Amino acid sequence: MTKSAMITICGRPNVGKSTLTNALVGEKIAIVSNKPQTTRNRITAIVNRGDTQFVLMDTPGFHKPRTRLGDYMVQVVRESVADVDAVLLMVEPVAAIGPQEEALIERLRESGAPAILLINKIDTVDKTRLLDVIALYSAAYDFDAVIPISAKTGEGLDELFTELEKYAVEGPHLFPDDMITDQPERQICAELVREKLLTCLDKEIPHGTAVEVTKFSERDDGIIDLEVTIYCEKDSHKGIIIGKKGAMLKKIGELARMDIDEFMGTKVYLQTWVKVKENWRDSMAQLRNFGYGER
């Protein structure tokens, strides 16, 4: 008998949610960087193990919003905690509960969904420190399970799947068995470009960028022609993104193309353009245009 489980992954920015998503799927479908608010939309990942299909929802980092884009991202998290079979609250191995975790725990109380505490990054600390973290969070909320993991090394992931199996419901799979994400190829390509913006640029500049695919076509020989436009909020930011004699934009494009080649499994010719849209993060029309619509 086939079974399915809908699972939401939530937590503060940079706690490792997207790294975990990629590790569970076994392929890179969610972009990763060391900067907060890397994930902007909910990303659905599909993992099949035996007769069970796990539908994992990677959500934006829960934070105090400063723009309408931030408002949208926080709302995505709030909605994703409801009407699922289980919620994974991912935290760092630190014996302190921050305001983001407090707000998410309160949302768990409201939703009533089964909740599993994931203590990530255990490869970076002495395991004896985990006892204090477990005691602190167990006093704050009655979690159904507590699982220490390392999304980076894979430690604890088999135990996580064993626990998630308990919440699977008998019935047909929700997605085809050969599907690993519901994201369109164009969207993943745009996100891979945005990941390189986050990697190569400093401070606020990458957070004020959006990427739009303006051309996606396949030749008879399988080569893909891809054109993307990078939008930023200021002319000064545009100059930094392009760089001296176009050096920065070339670097971003080359790094992105390598990942896109690997993801698409074929040669990709990538062209990048940079345009300015002032204050797009506070414009509902522009947010909808870039796929961050009202919920």
Regions from the language model: what does each represent?
Residues 1-83, 91:
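Conserved G1/Walker A P-loop phosphate-binding module
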